[in-house]
Amino acid sequence: MKIWVDADACPKVIRETIVRAAERTSVECTFVANHVVPVPRRPNIHSLQVPAGFDIADNEIVKRVEPNDLVITSDIPLADEVITKGGLALSSRGELYTKDTIKARLNIRDFMETMRSSGIQTGGPAALSQTERREFANHLDRILAKR
């Protein structure tokens, strides 16, 4: 198992949690973004900078992910592609996407996109709560314990 992080929009506190878990378990972890993502110098922790552009980081993750790899992302279409390839997808808010839940999440995302494109203000996501941080860390620990 490897961990791939869609780091373009990953909160710093979640990146720090991922690094600690990767260090503790010696799992290889790669942060993929279109900008420099500072990561500690460890043999199993890497940063991959891709060119700027729409979905370039996502496409790079999809290209590299293998069955049973874990992808940390809040990007619903990326999570869907990862699950289709046999990987695991966990949001930075602690939601583990599954084959059973991803289609509903895609439908909600598409509906919200339609509303935004028609001029309706939908607002952004709320700030990351302590509960969500804990939920993320707990899910991550459970996934890494099963590998």
Swiss-Prot record:
It comes from the Bacteria. InterPro entries: UPF0178. Signal peptide: none annotated. Belongs to the UPF0178 family. This is UPF0178 protein VV2566. It comes from Vibrio vulnificus (strain YJ016).
